[in-house]
Amino acid sequence: MEEEEEDYMSDAFINSLQDVRPGMSMPRRVKECYEKEEKHKEANIKNRQQKLKDVEKEKRDTKLNEALGNENKGFALLQKMGYKKGQALGKKGDGIVEPIPLNIKTGRSGIGHEEMKKRKAEENLESYRRKIQMRKHDEEQAADDFRMRMKSKREEIRLKADLSKSQRACMLLDGQKSISTPREAWYWPKMNEQEADEEADEETEEDEDLVEEELSTLEKLQILTSYLRGRHLFCIWCGTTYQDDEDMESNCPGDTAEDHN
């Protein structure tokens, strides 16, 4: 029985064929093989190009390292002018001996681009250094300002403590001498509101407050300690009442806290 001929127009035959129409995606295995082959070709081309560059460089370096012979017209002319092989250039013989190396440009950038790029990098580095220095200076200045503020704050606390101590001593010593009213309202510690209403007139208080507000803590301390030393021969830092001026002059270091440190 004769085999039936295939019907090339049948759906079964057409569906069995691979669809290779333009624009249709290839099977995954075929695509991978194709990409692998392309990468292999590219690698071979790059290797050949690299080998060619290496060969050219080797030949160039070999030629450049060879000394010029007498057959070279330029070298022969130098010899006629008195130059000897291996001699340094210049009248004094202190010039270069080796030729200036040849710098082969392989990039696509224009002439002067590398120099400009190098200069730009140096400028950026210098700018970065300046910023670092400025930041360091600002940080040091901020630290100094903070230390000064803390020092001023501690100093103000100490001055207020010394003033309070002086006010209490003044009230006690004035009382021992039957002085019932302080020379200035702030010479003594502040009384509570009830005592103040009973002891002082409102207008007088307002005038004294104005004077008090004009004085700093340091100024008040200087005035009050001077009063205590002159009126009562008392030093708050020594904590001593002296017998007379001579006794105070001989035994008290001075009229400030620093003198007693």
Curated annotation (Swiss-Prot):
Keyword tags: Centromere, Chromosome, Coiled coil, Kinetochore
Disulfide cross-links: none
Pfam families in alphabetical order: DUF4187 (PF13821), G-patch (PF01585)
Coiled coil as UniProt keyword: yes
SMART domains registered for this protein in UniProt: DUF4187, G_patch
Subcellular compartments: Chromosome, Centromere, Kinetochore
Positions with biased composition (Acidic residues): 194-213
Coiled coil region boundaries: 31-65, 190-222
GO MF entries: nucleic acid binding
Sequence ranges of Basic and acidic residues compositional bias: 29-64, 111-124
Domain of life (superkingdom): Eukaryota
Main subcellular location: nucleus
Family affiliation: Belongs to the GPATCH11 family.
Protein name, UniProt field: G patch domain-containing protein 11
Annotated organism of origin: Xenopus tropicalis (Western clawed frog)
